[in-house]
Amino acid sequence: PAVFDDIAEIRAFSKTPIDLHLITNNPEVYFDRINALEIEMVTLQFEDLNGYSYNGGLKSKMGLAIVSETDISVFDNVSDNYDFLLMMATTPGQSGGRFDKVNFRKIRKFKRAHPTKQVHVDGGVNAEVSFILRNMSVHSSVVGSYLFKDQPVGAALLNLKIHDIDSHYAVGDFMRSREEIPLLGPDNRSLTEVLQSMDDFKLGFTILENEHSEMEGIISNADLRKEVLRNDGLTEKSEGVAETPNHACSRALRQR
C-alpha cells in the first residue's frame, strides 16, 4: 500500500514517532515492511481480524483497536500480546463525529481490569473531551478535524491542554458509579479489609458508610501510614489493628 511509501518519505525528514492503524484480516503480510521502516506503534482493528490472533513478529509497540459497540473484554485473552487499547469513540473513518460518552465508562472499566496497560482514544476529541480524558489518565488521544476548523491550528493545540473549560457533558456522563468505588460498611472495617478495598479498586482511599448507606468518612493511604507510625508498626496488636482504620478516619475528618 502507498502508506508505506508515505512513511518512508516522512522518515527522510522527521523523527516523529509513527502509529500505524491496520484494518485488515491478514496483517502479517505487512510485517516485513513495518519492521524495515521501524514503525514505533502498530494498532490492529479487532472487528476486522476475523479470528486472527497476533502472537509476535513485530518490534513495534502493539495496540488493539475496538469500536464503541465492542466490549473491552475482548482484550482479556490477548493482553499479553498488546501494550495498549485504542478506543474508537466515533464511527471509524468518519471525520468530525461526536464523541460517544459510553466510552467514559469503558475507559474506567479497562483501567481497572488492566492497570498496567495504556488507553488511547481516537474520535470526537476536542478541548472539552481532551480535558476529561486527561483527568481519566488516558495516555494518548488522536485529534483530527478539531485542529482544522473554526480556529487557527496553534490555538486549537493550546485549547487541548487547558485546565479550565466550560463543559457540555454532565458529571454523570463520566463519574464513577457506586459499583466502581471502594466502599466499606460498619461491619467490614478491619485493617486488612481496608487495605484490600484500596488494592481491589486501585485507589488511594476507601469510603466508609453506615447501615443506611450514608457516608461516614474517608480513609486514605496517608491516614493508614500515620496510624502505622503511631502504633510502632501495629505489631502483634490484633484488637487494635481492627479498630485502627476507624481511629485514623476520625482524626482525619476532625483535621479537615
Please give the residue ranges for each predicted region.
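Hydrophobic faces of well-ordered beta-strands that scaffold small-molecule active sites
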Residues: 18-22, 40-44, 62-66, 85-87, ...
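Glycine-rich beta-to-alpha transition loops that act as phosphate-gripper elements at the mouths
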Residues: 20-27, 65-72, 118-128, 186-188, ...
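Catalytic cores of alpha/beta
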Residues: 25-38, 69-81, 123-141
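Glycine-rich phosphate-binding active-site loops on the catalytic face of alpha/beta enzymes
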Residues: 42-51, 86-98, 136-157
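C-terminal helical cap(s) of enzyme catalytic domains, especially alpha/beta-barrels
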Residues: 55-57, 134, 148-168
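Histidine/lysine/aspartate-rich catalytic loop segments that bind and position anionic ligands
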Residues: 65-100
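Bateman/CBS regulatory modules and CBS-like beta-alpha motifs in cytosolic regions of diverse proteins
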Residues: 164-197, 203, 209-210, 215-218, ...
